[in-house]
């Protein structure tokens, strides 16, 4: 670390170069300090030594500034990549500038950053009067009992702020100003599949090709999307939907123009073309999504509050004396008991139990969800009426026990209104009930008016591990039609018409058996007015595992109202891992028996291969007792950085088929065009300029292209996403200061994760000046050829050694060890043509 001519510290980015040599320097200094303390006549209470001892022992120039190394915990000021903790909870990771204040490193944090952390700035006039960009190095000067501390070895910055001056924010809360709208871009997600089919006894073959395209464009907060398909069977392109969308942060909502679907919690959903404003729960922290009760209590002192469910701690916090409210519990099960433990400062504990239960429609206390839709109904059959309409819905959590909801649909020949409530019965579970009234003009002078009733019940039996849900959904009177049924109503030539639903019953039970596995039962039945019979589906199953072998037994029953026949299938599946003999593979056996007494047997071998397991394969052979037919299948899929390729071959007694496919994405962005795997909704552009073939951790097959770019095809919107590069996959000529970036994309965004790379060589220089070694503590800086080049500096260690990475084949290095003109020099270097096996060049360099 050096000083300029004015006596100020020169700051620079601290990188791996410093880490490589700082430890030997500190060991050397500590050794000298120990010797000095042993021979000194005075004893000090802290680790301190006279820096002049270094001059006498090592011949250092008297003007070199090494005062920052005097104390054991002292490090040079500069910019460090640190984990940031607020009151012992990690809130961020990033670059922070540090300066020397009172002989220790102190962070420079802007006032607006404290506000973003949740500090109530308005409580402190001296703070609120400052501009938002004001850099604060000692927050304790403004807020009593506030402080910061930096653990250099752990690269951890701890900020302590009294809880009383923090605004109440939910856990995992991400401020909206951190949400990133992303880059302007164009994108295409494609999925191509084709097949060649041969039938025995018929000449030639038939070919089928299908292309699925999901294309779009991003500009600021706006997202334009289109979904189109092409089929060779009818040789026709079809545009299925097009819409323009953006988020409205202040309303926690999405605004959509074009083709979309109405939300379905209250009314059955249907497709429309128009405009919609709808709540988006993704904008809420995980701790505020779904349903969880609000906990209220009173603390007599500074107390610890612990909340347990089923004996496990699910929440813990500290509160000040007086009433407290906890409203950011994560949703767990649909019902149960919460044990609340308040531990006072003197060790006394107060315990209480709060039961809760929730059906899917229920919201947290004071939570609001809404939707507003204007548009034109889109008939899926293209034979129904397509009127203009308006639909509005609202749901509100009144308390822990009550949620109310309602909505309306208005059209020229149809209107309906729905009102309902969800109610918690505590230990008895929870239920919801609503009524919908509708009046419709089905055809000219044909009017219909009726009601529909919906009931839903949910209960978790914690003691037995049973989850039980029953929904009497819905019972409708003869003249009730929902909006879709009314528009699809059609009188045929024989005076019959499309029947409307009469009732629908659903049942779902899931039972855990502990180590013995689990069972489930799912049942569904629906019938219609003016139509005999009913539609019924039943499925049940049991699953368990023993010695890593998985067993599954399933039964299904299905019946349509238009027929008296039903289908029943019983199946047994056994999956055996083959890791001992073949890595990442397993064998399966399946036995299936149908009501028609057709029995089939299937054995298969499945697995993954290659270094990153991005090649999957499957081999199957089956036998059916019906006509003694046999068949088989072999298929494989490769998942690469630029897309996914699959192929397969099927055969049976009468036919053969060869199928193939290609899936992937193409993204055009401000830095060029990048090919990728199949695209999701929210994307990340990895930019490691010039670093080819660098893998992205936790994403199979994804690596940077020849320019250093890659697309991460899916990310969580409005959440912190950590994008990390695999440093072991970097070339010898690639160096990077920070291998992890944190981004917070909005829905549909292409967000940039920009990694600062240095492309060049690694060099260890043995520096000398006028026949003497360059003193340790000096700085060696690569002279920039362009203003856009990143700074590249290091500290000279003992023996005059300087390590630099990411430097070009030839160049100039500026060395400085004091604030006098005579205490600097420059060295021109040229690396040999032959690259050493270690990848590290070692050169002797005379500095002039």
Where would I find each of the regions flagged by the language model?
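Post-signal-peptide, soluble extracytosolic/periplasmic N-terminal scaffold domains
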Residues: 4, 44-289, 595-667
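Outer-membrane beta-barrel translocator/channel fold
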Residues: 259-271, 432-503, 553-573, 591-600, ...
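Short, acidic Ser/Thr/Gly-rich low-complexity loop/linker segments typical of extracellular
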Residues: 95-97, 701-709, 787-801
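Residues on the lipid-exposed face of transmembrane beta-strands in outer-membrane beta-barrel proteins
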Residues: 190, 213-217, 241-246, 392-396, ...
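Residues that define the transmembrane beta-barrel architecture of outer-membrane proteins
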Residues: 184, 205-211, 236-240, 291, ...
